[in-house]
């Protein structure tokens, strides 16, 4: 027990090395730009002031978003998703996978669970001993289940998920702007030092190296930022991009796609004034998520992904799943309610549900 605890402590200590490295590079870049470039190299005072004001604006936003990404604790599933004591004992005693799934299905009927494993089973974490909410995954590094997990990032030593994904995207954006601003403003002095138009001073090394480092980081961050912008536009996580979520009717990589504008608001919120600020404004609670509409066949309980129209008295309406009293795991009860609704209006009714995961 003691050796494993010691190893765990060493791993936690070593996991901060990338964060320390990034902070050392940022501290050096701050010194090189403010002191060696602006104070010792740039002769014009007005140019110094303009460079410093804009630089500190980017630096502040970059550090703010970086700190929020690091410090935001990943949200974990609530006790509601843990098995009750009686069911847990039955589950642990049962050796047959089919019987274990029956136990999980009974518990999952009361939970907003709409995604499954590749084999159609309830997603259960044996490590955390809970039923995984939709889009929730277990992080082997943090040893916890994380809501809407995207990935574990060593550069922030934290899991990127529902609680801090917006901060992570902003961190990439502002770090990219920070690098491109430094490279653009340093370029003319880089050329002057390189061509010996300026005398050799202690600032020469800092200015030359600062340009190379800023350009290198900009190029590497640009590809990662572009990829995550694409993910935001598709309303996918990195995990979902590699492994499509499985709904009742099978895998669907576009299961959570709502349209470009709505996809963006899922991450950044519906108030644009907060989009550029590392302030939490993402929509939802991390447990349930709106998805494309699905049709429930009243007669057979079949579910099909498509654009749904619910026609009652000639009117077309769409009803979100959160407003429905039926879970996808409770087909019998849902079919009864839907059938009664069809009888009352004296015509076929297509019940519309918005799948949440």
From Swiss-Prot:
Cytoplasmic domain ranges by topology: 1-14, 72-166, 229-357
Pfam families: DHHC
Coiled-coil region: none
Highest taxon, organism lineage: Eukaryota
GO annotation, cellular component aspect: endoplasmic reticulum; endoplasmic reticulum membrane; endoplasmic reticulum-Golgi intermediate compartment membrane; Golgi apparatus; Golgi membrane; perinuclear region of cytoplasm; plasma membrane
GO BP annotation list: protein palmitoylation; protein targeting to membrane; synaptic vesicle maturation
Side of membrane Lumenal, spans: 36-50, 188-204
InterPro entries registered for this protein in UniProt: Palmitoyltrfase_DHHC (IPR001594), PFA4/ZDH16/20/ERF2-like (IPR039859)
Function per UniProt: Palmitoyltransferase that could catalyze the addition of palmitate onto various protein substrates. Catalyzes palmitoylation of Cys residues on protein substrates and has a preference for acyl-CoA with C16 fatty acid chains but may also utilize acyl-CoA with C14 and C18 fatty acid chains.
Family membership: Belongs to the DHHC palmitoyltransferase family.
Record's protein name: Palmitoyltransferase ZDHHC20-A
């Amino acid at each position: 027990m003691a050796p494993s605890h010691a190893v765990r402590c060493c791993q936690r200590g070593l996991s901060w090395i990338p964060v320390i490295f990034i902070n050392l590079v940022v501290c050096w870049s701050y010194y090189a730009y403010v002191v060696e470039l602006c104070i010792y190299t740039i002769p014009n005072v007005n140019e110094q002031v303009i460079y410093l004001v804009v630089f500190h604006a980017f630096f502040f936003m970059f550090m703010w978003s970086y700190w929020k990404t690091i410090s935001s604790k990943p949200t974990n599933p609530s006790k509601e998703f843990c098995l009750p004591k009686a069911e847990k004992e039955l589950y642990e005693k049962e050796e047959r996978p089919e019987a274990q799934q029956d136990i999980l299905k009974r518990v999952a009927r009361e939970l907003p669970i709409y995604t499954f494993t590749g084999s159609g089973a309830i997603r259960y974490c044996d490590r955390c001993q809970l039923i995984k909410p939709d889009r929730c995954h277990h992080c082997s590094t943090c040893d916890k289940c994380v809501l809407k997990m995207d990935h574990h990032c060593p550069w922030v030593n934290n899991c990127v998920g529902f609680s801090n994904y917006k901060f992570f995207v902003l961190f990439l954006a502002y770090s990219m702007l920070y690098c491109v601003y430094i490279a653009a403003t340093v370029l003319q002095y880089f050329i002057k030092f390189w061509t010996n138009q300026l005398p050799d001073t202690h600032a020469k090394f800092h200015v030359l190296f600062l340009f190379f480092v800023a350009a290198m980081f900009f190029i590497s961050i640009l590809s990662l930022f572009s990829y995550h912008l694409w993910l935001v536009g598709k309303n996918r996580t990195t995990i979902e991009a590699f492994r499509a979520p499985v709904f009742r009717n099978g895998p669907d990589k576009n299961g959570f796609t709502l349209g470009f504008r709505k996809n963006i608001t899922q991450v950044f919120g519906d108030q644009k004034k907060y989009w550029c600020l590392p302030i939490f404004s993402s929509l939802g609670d991390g447990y349930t998520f709106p998805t494309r509409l699905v049709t429930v066949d009243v007669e057979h309980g079949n579910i099909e992904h498509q654009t749904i129209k619910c026609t009652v008295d000639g009117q077309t309406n769409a009803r979100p799943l959160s407003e429905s009293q039926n879970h996808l795991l409770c087909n019998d009860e849902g079919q009864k309610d839907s059938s009664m609704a069809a009888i009352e209006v004296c015509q076929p009714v297509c019940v519309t549900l918005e799948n949440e995961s």
